[in-house]
Design a protein with these regions (language model features):
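Conserved beta/loop motifs at nucleotide-recognition and modification sites
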Residues: 1-150
Length: 150
């Protein structure tokens, strides 16, 4: 496990409290080597955004290796069916090809959708993998669009 910092712990608690208070942002980018925090915030979002009895219609979960950015954007831009709000989550987003293409969603986000991207960087330096590049326009747009947690 990556070294826990007080900054990430404090930020985790602040985001957790916002979610528990029902203050949902339209976009969450949860990334980095702190897999525990990513999993906990993702689970909390999935448990909180849509009531349990509406999850069949209001909760969509994709896995990065199995979905394109275009499909994620298309789903997130759809109006929720038979529910007030929907949550679209991409788990293992580090496996996606062209994750930065999700950036087009920021131009026309749906107020009835919460989009969560869970991107886990490898903890083991011997394993290949990458983290989100903070210099990209995708990262900068994500910061403006919602919550970015590392």
């Amino acid at each position: 496990m990556a070294k826990q910092t007080s900054d990430s712990s404090t930020e985790f608690k602040a985001i957790r409290n916002q979610i528990l208070e029902g203050d949902f942002k339209p976009f969450y980018l949860l990334f980095g080597k702190e897999h525990y925090y990513i999993d906990e915030l993702c689970k909390l979002l999935m448990d909180s955004v849509v009531p349990e009895d509406q999850k069949d219609f209001g909760q969509i979960v994709y896995y990065g290796a199995d979905v394109s950015a275009a499909r994620v954007v298309s789903t997130a831009r759809q109006f929720p069916m038979m529910v007030e709000r929907q949550i679209v989550v991409v788990k293992e987003a580090q496996m996606m090809k062209k994750i930065e293409d999700i950036g087009v969603y920021f131009e026309g986000m749906m107020p009835s959708t919460v989009l969560g991207i869970c991107y886990k960087a490898p903890n083991d330096p011997t394993k290949s993998g990458r983290n989100i590049d903070k210099r990209t326009s995708f990262y900068k747009q994500a910061q403006k669009a919602g919550v970015v947690f590392e």
